[in-house]
Amino acid sequence: LSTKESPENEKDDSRKGIKALTKNSQATTRNTATTEASKELKDQTNKVASQKEYKNHDPIILVHGFNGYASGTGPITGKGNYWGGDRLKIIQDYRAKGYNVMEASVSAFGSNYDRAVELYYYIKGGRVDYGAAHAAKYGHERYGKTYAGAYKDWKPGQKIHLIGHSMGGQTIRYLEELLRHGSPEEVEYQKQHGGDISPLYKGGQDNMISSITTIATPHNGTHAADLLGNEEIIRQVAYDYARSKGNKLSHVDVGLSQWGLKQREDETLAQYIQRVKQSKLWTTKDNGFYDLTTEGTDILNHKTSLNPNIVYKTYQGESTRPGPNGTQKADVNMNIGYTLTANTIGKVKDKAWRENDGLVSVISGQYPLNQAHTSATDQVQKGVWQVTPVKHNWDHGDFVGTDTSEVRISKEELEDFWDNMFEDMVRNEKVTDKQ
């Protein structure tokens, strides 16, 4: 009896995968924090106190993934949080342990470029400037929201640690590249058209990041995004969110206001929905859906490079088991929301990509395939991806505590994982702060 999937079954799996991904917000987990949305900009957390009060000299900033939300901006309030779920409160817990740690707020569905720019302004403060050339190229507004600034003194010599979960790791890599090398497109556009240009696009800003740590990041893309498709999933998810959550009374910020997905004060709901239908968002590749594909990520990998002054480290899990003919199947203890995508990834043509955490293949989460890597040891190394051992039985959400049904990974194990990572940051500073 052949176990080869029929085209009809493959299509059915893809349709089910689309439904599951939409329902479960999957290219990373959904945040549902309780902080009032009105506090997001004013109480953007995170005033940096005197370093002598903390274990870490350089502030630690956590960057959420696709369809992730910072405190108070998510679609469902009162039922957990992105960083720790119901198991930990990573921001509060680690501040109590003596660490200077913050959570960034960037677009839930935006492209890595847009999210990287937002992350820059989240840290530095000011009104988001996506760049005149970028805005003209893709057809969205040049300016976005205004951030209060979590670390206004951030500049060369004043470093930070960046930790990204899922797509957050890609976003961090893009920001680092912009800091060092800027945007030649923006520089050229300004030369031709005049006007102002953000310091971010001029480049030359090194010695600002101490370490980059990625957790379950699809450095080489995810077949889940490939199979779902860019346009269909955007229409299904973003339009529904925009229609239901982008109205004037909603606290939800999906991070697509630059595309017009926010109702204006003088606009009726009917007028808003009609305007949304005309947005160029529906046909663009300037969004997170495309950037998570293997094609979109390949572009990112060839745009970015390793900084010899930064400590890089990756963490990746797996929660699949061998199936027929070399396939991989979701483990019985995997979060049920990931099982369809896990099984779909587990059948892709290239066997090296089949083992996965429900959303990201192990081979994708370890390091960008075109960049230098080595096995992580106790020695602090810079300018190379230090790959930690694969964490077996850990699915995509286990790292951030959002799998409420998890029985094999205890709260203590999760806390140990984060304890070790934060202690690692402090050890890194003994090397990186000498620069």
Please give the residue ranges for each predicted region.
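Short, aromatic- and cysteine-enriched interfacial helices/patches
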Residues: 2, 18-22, 340, 371
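Bacterial Sec-dependent N-terminal signal peptides
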Residues: 2-9
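Hydrophobic transmembrane signal anchors and adjacent membrane-proximal interface regions, especially
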Residues: 3, 20, 46, 81-82, ...
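Short amphipathic alpha-helical segments that mediate assembly, nucleic-acid/protein binding
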Residues: 11-15, 34, 38-41, 252, ...
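N-terminal non-catalytic accessory region
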Residues: 15-17, 21, 30-236, 393-435
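Helical cap/lid subdomain of alpha/beta-hydrolase-fold lipid enzymes
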Residues: 177, 181-435
